Amino acid sequence: MTDSQDKVNGGSKNTFLSRVFGVHSSAVENSLDAAEMSHITMPTEQDFSNYAEDEGNVRLIESDQEPSSSNEDSNDEEPLIQQPQSIRFDTASDGMATIQSESEPDEGGTEEDEVHLEEEDFSDQDLASSVSKYGQPSSSEDEEPLSNRDSNRGSDETIPFIGRQRLNLGGKNPITGATKSTKNPSESRVFERLLGNSPAKMFRNNGRPNNLEESFLFRKPSVAEQSGPGKSTHFNLKPPPIFNNISTLTSTSKNSLSSLSPKERALWKWANIENLDTFLQQVYEYYLGNGFYCIITEKVIHLATILFVVFISTYMGHCIDYSRLSSSHTFEEIHIEQCYKTQISPTAKVFLWIFYAFIGLKVLQLYFDVKALKDIRNFYNYLLSISDKDLQTIPWQSVIQQLVLLKDQNAITANATEVKAKNRLSAHDVANRIMRKENFVIALYDNNILDLSLPVPLLRTCALTKTLEWNINLCILGFAFNEKGYLKQAFLRESQREYLGEELKKRFVLAGFLNIILSPFLVTYFVLLNFFRYFNEYKTSPGSIGSRQYTPIAEWKFREYNELYHIFQKRMRLSMIIADNYVNQFPNTLLSLTLSFIQFVSGSFVAILGILTIFDPDNFLNFEITPDRTVLFYMTVFGTLWAVCHSSINDEYTVLKPEETLEELVSYTHYAPKEWKGKYHTEDIKNEFCRLYNLRITLLLRELVSIIITPFILWFSLPKNSERIIDFFRECTVYEEGLGYVCKYAMFEATKIDKGTKAKKQTKRMFSQAEQDDSETESDEGVNKMLQSYMYFVDDYKNAGNAVGKNQLPASPIEPSYHPYSSTKDYSWKTQFALGKNSNRKRNLNRSRVKRFPDRSSDLELGSLSGSLINKSTLFKDDIADNADELKAGNGVMGLLNQYYKKSDRNR
């Protein structure tokens, strides 16, 4: 084992494991040299035999199935969902990033034609200039002699540099999916129209150093870890250690974990992951929660908040004698002794005991959460070399880098069986696993699948609220995904469409009845919670009643595919400054006049009552103007009303430049419908934006009303969309090797948008020509959203200015911009979400510019498989043997109540 480590660390041998996991070099301290960790690669034709199919011709998730036998490897049936080509994002030395693609070579191709499939041997000196390897062989038998590869490299050097195929994120053009040889002028014109006739500006580094291009996504250490002026904060993270006893630990039984040290236990957990999605979600939630003690404190405070609201409301409602309040002078005079026995009714006692049982279950759940959090803490501390105190400032990119390094460094200790486990670990794959469900939700709202209106004249357009959103996620996602977090196979079968639609309708109706039963308690809790939370804020600063925030539907519209929550949340918070500036530029004279009159009247009453109080301050304050309403009460009411009106009147002079301000705002929200083009200065666009960026007090009232009307939406509106929702999952699902079934838009491959599943083509035949045109328009919108998400995803992980903590902003100075629409305010955080340094340069990414792309079904190309340290024998098997049992699981009353309990403290 020591010899093998020396060979790998020395970087002098290109062994089998180095071909699978990348060459390790001591000069870069075993940095990210594994191609499978940094981009989506392509397999050889031998990998086609690894596809698994069930009896219904539906492919199993590779990470969830048993090792296939030699007989099963010969199965060459076509899968349900075909594999399209992947994206390649190249970066040249001049700072210009290009998009390239590769076609699968023909069997009769020459060696020169297939040179791009060969692996390149490289070192640290020529890493930046050499062509990276495209794929990883699946076994040592595929290893090619070094002499042959030298000849291949020589033939490659004869090709002009500008014509070479260069490696980056994927392999296929995300716009057309075409190879370089099939590119034609019409496709170039489509690409130019998409990027506003200036594609170079979309991908240019705008003067950044050339070494900035070599991020950890592209096989070199992240720039965030390089010191120097103008670069991000330097984090002295130690590379994950190499463990020599991993083979012994992997054979340790689960019952013997108590005898292991925390470090060995963390390594055993890592090597025996049963569900990679759940594990990565726990790692990310631990990062969001800022460590062990912060997460535990947050959970305890959440339980304490619920207890306080219930206790104080029960006590104030049953243990205080309000009839003696005016004539009493001490608390003992109004307090009712033994109020629990004498004042609380038996029905109320039953509900209190149910509440106490709920709290007891939450405390028990907290106990198990503590045990799970300890394992994640050990994983961070011992395997990733990241302490809890660093989580508040360390960027997520560094966590990803440590994850990749952990797998890369300890791969030398894994045996041949373990490295065949098809679990890729890169920034794109990690984001897809963490957001497997969220990506479907983004597409669900972006494609306007749900009908939230009611057949009532005044409630035909019902806005999405947190309560309704929570119920929708519970009904749809809880039904579409199994307990392991994977999409149920029945959703991919056209024959199950009617059955699934009926089951989903029943689920909506059942959820509506549960909301009716719980609505009295939810309304009471919601009113009390928000009263305690916002009363003091509105009392001390009445002007905050006019504050705004984004609506729930706006958040889903603005969020990009594979955009993690902390990145999205920071983007939304930073955009609020510009959003307020945009809204305040539109004066409302009618409202100002009305508020001025109300301010005058309320101020007059306060002045009159105040003057009268001077003559008899002891008695006049308790003088009742109306029954049980004293002077002090009315002075408080009129004073608050005056303060609210005064703060709502905007009498400041502002610079009227709505076009420039909204352009700047769009650079953060990433949302600009084609209907807005050329109308940024109009009142209609401002009102439409205000529906997305509404008053907070309005949203609170909507949430209160939503608790009452949500059951009716679940009964009458959403059941009509059941079959459409089933079609959505079937059409928006693709199979990705090593990941399983994911949302097609999250893979950043335009070929998957057009192809989808076989069921999508069968469904299209049932619609008229006009409906097909509408479908094509929606597909174009989906392609635009996908392309936009791809660009910002690359920028989030490749731009050094974005490698900051969750609550930090880049400290690098802003270079002056000469864009005619640049803002007059020099925000120090503009580079946080900019493509390159020039943050004020607006991206002319209009989502209406992409036209329908030609179908290229013959250009399909598969991504390569990569090895893993994870034991394949411990990966669970997807239990799809009985489709009926899988669909019926959790659909009854108790199953839905169980999901209500599990998700009761999320998004509510």
Curated annotation (Swiss-Prot):
It is found in: Preautophagosomal structure membrane; Cytoplasmic vesicle membrane; Golgi apparatus membrane; Endoplasmic reticulum membrane. Residues 508-528, 697-717 dip into the membrane without crossing it. Residues 1-299, 371-507, 529-594, 651-696, 718-908 are cytoplasmic. Residues 103-124 have a biased composition (Acidic residues). Phosphorylated by ATG1. ATG1 phosphorylation is required for preautophagosome elongation. Residues 37-188 are annotated as: Disordered. The chain crosses the membrane at residues 300-320, 350-370, 595-615, 630-650. It catalyses: a 1,2-diacyl-sn-glycero-3-phosphocholine(in) = a 1,2-diacyl-sn-glycero-3-phosphocholine(out); a 1,2-diacyl-sn-glycero-3-phospho-L-serine(in) = a 1,2-diacyl-sn-glycero-3-phospho-L-serine(out); a 1,2-diacyl-sn-glycero-3-phosphoethanolamine(in) = a 1,2-diacyl-sn-glycero-3-phosphoethanolamine(out); a 1,2-diacyl-sn-glycero-3-phospho-(1D-myo-inositol-3-phosphate)(in) = a 1,2-diacyl-sn-glycero-3-phospho-(1D-myo-inositol-3-phosphate)(out). It is a multi-pass membrane protein. Residues 126-139, 176-187 have a biased composition (Polar residues). The keyword Transmembrane helix applies. GO terms for biological process: autophagy of mitochondrion; lipid transport; piecemeal microautophagy of the nucleus; protein localization to phagophore assembly site; reticulophagy. It holds the Pfam family ATG9. Keywords: Autophagy, Cytoplasmic vesicle, Endoplasmic reticulum, Golgi apparatus, Lipid transport, Membrane, Phosphoprotein, Transmembrane, Transmembrane helix, Transport. It comes from the Eukaryota. Residues 321-349, 616-629 are lumenal. Residues 146-156 have a biased composition (Basic and acidic residues). InterPro entries: Autophagy-rel_prot_9. One of its GO terms (cellular component) is phagophore assembly site membrane. Phospholipid scramblase involved in autophagy and cytoplasm to vacuole transport (Cvt) vesicle formation. Cycles between the preautophagosomal structure/phagophore assembly site (PAS) and the cytoplasmic vesicle pool and supplies membrane for the growing autophagosome. Lipid scramblase activity plays a key role in preautophagosomal structure/phagophore assembly by distributing the phospholipids that arrive through ATG2 from the cytoplasmic to the luminal leaflet of the bilayer, thereby driving autophagosomal membrane expansion. Required for mitophagy. Belongs to the ATG9 family. Homotrimer; forms a homotrimer with a central pore that forms a path between the two membrane leaflets. Forms a homotrimer with a solvated central pore, which is connected laterally to the cytosol through the cavity within each protomer. Acts as a lipid scramblase that uses its central pore to function: the central pore opens laterally to accommodate lipid headgroups, thereby enabling lipid flipping and redistribution of lipids added to the outer leaflet of ATG9-containing vesicles, thereby enabling growth into autophagosomes. This is Autophagy-related protein 9. It comes from Kluyveromyces lactis (strain ATCC 8585 / CBS 2359 / DSM 70799 / NBRC 1267 / NRRL Y-1140 / WM37).
